[in-house]
């Protein structure tokens, strides 16, 4: 446990162990992308391998279930893939938390800063009832935590309650966990 929050590595589950192996064996590393000095961890090979993808989805679904998810929030873009699969496995609905400009109006918008710029997330302002619902946010990577913190604010603005964050991997040294506050963070593979 890290600061009272589950890092994912405390779990002795078979699902978590399989997912860690899958991530270790299939993650591709790209130096100096998207900017000089950044090591990008590309999960494309993990997602493209059926067994590796299933292992990660199973571990994330287990964590989301433990967090009492009533609906899954998948972050643009790889969070859509993982979040949809987790929601399907758990028999839950999924909401796509989109980057700015991808949804028709009216929308609810939340601005935030990245480690290499700024951006915004959006949800539809109509047709989505999150009032009082327990939302677990799912994405591929925890870096600075800016995107996830913005997603939490967006969900809360729409009336939902974020009960946890579930990530495949974490990039160390960027303060991501600290930025997320006291909500549980489940990470399959901690920083390398």
Curated annotation (Swiss-Prot):
Biological process per Gene Ontology, one example term: adenine salvage
Domain of life: Bacteria
EC number of this enzyme: 2.4.2.7
Regions annotated as coiled coil: none
InterPro entries recorded: Ade_phspho_trans, PRibTrfase_dom, PRTase-like, UPRTase/APRTase
Protein keywords: Cytoplasm, Glycosyltransferase, Purine salvage, Transferase
GO molecular function: adenine binding; adenine phosphoribosyltransferase activity; AMP binding
SUPFAM superfamilies tied to this protein: PRTase-like
Signal sequence interval, chain numbering: none
GO cellular component, one term: cytoplasm
Pathway given in the UniProt record: Purine metabolism; AMP biosynthesis via salvage pathway; AMP from adenine: step 1/1
One Pfam short name: Pribosyltran
Major site of localization recorded for this protein: cytoplasm
Cellular location(s): Cytoplasm
Reactions catalysed, as given in the entry: AMP + diphosphate = 5-phospho-alpha-D-ribose 1-diphosphate + adenine
Described purpose of this protein according to its UniProt entry: Catalyzes a salvage reaction resulting in the formation of AMP, that is energically less costly than de novo synthesis.
Family: Belongs to the purine/pyrimidine phosphoribosyltransferase family.
NCBIfam families per the UniProt record, alphabetical: PRK02304.1-3, PRK02304.1-5
Subunit architecture: Homodimer.
Protein's UniProt name: Adenine phosphoribosyltransferase
Species this chain originates from: Corynebacterium efficiens (strain DSM 44549 / YS-314 / AJ 12310 / JCM 11189 / NBRC 100395)
């Amino acid at each position: 446990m890290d600061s009272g929050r589950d890092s994912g590595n405390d779990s002795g589950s078979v699902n978590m162990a399989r997912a860690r192996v899958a991530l270790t064996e299939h993650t591709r590393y790209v130096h100096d992308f998207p900017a000089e000095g950044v090591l990008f961890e590309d999960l494309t090979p993990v997602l493209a391998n059926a067994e590796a993808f299933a292992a990660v989805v199973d571990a994330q679904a287990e964590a989301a279930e433990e967090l009492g998810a009533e609906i899954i929030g998948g972050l643009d873009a790889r969070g859509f893939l993982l979040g949809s699969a987790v929601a399907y496995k758990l028999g839950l609905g999924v909401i796509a938390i989109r980057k700015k400009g991808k949804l028709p109006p009216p929308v609810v918008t939340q601005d935030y800063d990245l480690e290499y710029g700024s951006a915004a997330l959006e949800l539809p302002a109509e047709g989505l009832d999150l009032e009082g619902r327990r939302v677990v946010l799912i994405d591929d990577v925890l870096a600075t935590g800016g995107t996830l913190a913005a997603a939490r604010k967006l969900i809360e603005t729409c009336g939902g309650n974020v009960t946890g964050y579930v990530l495949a991997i974490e990039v160390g040294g960027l303060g991501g966990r600290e930025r997320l506050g006291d909500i549980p963070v489940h990470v399959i593979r901690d920083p390398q």
